[in-house]
Amino acid sequence: MTSTDLHLPRGATANAPYAVDIGPERAGWTHSSLRVVELAPGGSHAFTAGDSEWIVLPLEGGCTVQIETASTGQCEFQLLGRESVFANVSDFAYVPRDARVLIASGAGGRFALAGAKCERRLPARYGPAPEVPVEERGSGTCARRVRNFASADSFDCDKLIAVEVITPGGNWSSYPPHKHDEHRPGEESELEEIYYFEIDGPNGLGYQRVFPSREGGADVLAEVRSGDAVLVPDGWHGPSIAQPGHDMYYLNVMAGPGRTREWRICFHPDHTDTTGGYR
């Protein structure tokens, strides 16, 4: 698959009320989903979780999340949110499969819904911002900040893995190139991945590379801007490159068929000398 199939520019998947609407059918895979809903002041949006678990993550602004399940009834979480994805870490809400959800925002805002098809029905929960592990990964021009709000070892989900990355302007991240497209116990996980991008400042841009790990595999070299997404069904991915003077944000959403929810990656053999700066 090529850049045309896997690079989704801003608006390419818009499906009111969603500015971004990427599900398994649109992506051509089985597990991972991402939606971004934009609410006007006083606006609200209702949806049903179906056979997926979801995390409601404020990108800009705060909201109230009401969650109703047949087994536990209704609960409500107040998400303080944030001014922008570049400002700080946000709190979030976990939505179990089969739930009914209402998101409402007095001041308006933008909210990501990261999802994964799943089997277990876990309880609805609130994720406080102070409890999100923040990792300073890499060094020099490969330094970046990783917000592990729903990584495999920081927050319990059935299948969903999601993190945020801030790459300073002029730096590389998602580097060295790595992959997670095979099930090799103890060495590599099989995970579909969505990159959703925002760039700080007007006219900012970045670049994303994905190249094949097998014949006919994913092959992308894309200029990305705010609101763009890149799909990684397979293949080596990285680097993600931020334009000098413009910090780059991306939200990674991952899920796969493995019985164990884990993030295990394999580095490209041509770049093994740089893996020490990755984690």
Regions found by a protein language model. Give the residues of each.
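Conserved metal-binding segment of the jelly-roll/cupin
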Residues: 86-106, 116, 223-244
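Glycine- and acidic-residue-biased ligand/ion/polar-headgroup-sensing regions
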Residues: 50-77, 95, 169, 181-229, ...
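A short glycine-rich, His/Asp/Glu-containing loop-to-beta-strand
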Residues: 12-46, 53, 143-194
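Conserved hydrophobic/aromatic beta-strand scaffold that supports enzyme active sites
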Residues: 34-38, 92-94, 113, 162-166, ...
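Double-stranded beta-helix
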Residues: 84, 109-151, 244, 251-279
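Acidic/histidine-enriched, beta-strand-rich ligand/metal-binding domains
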Residues: 198, 203-279
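Extended, compositionally biased flexible segments
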Residues: 26, 33-104
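Short, structured patches in soluble enzyme cores that scaffold and shape functional sites
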Residues: 97, 105, 113-117, 150, ...
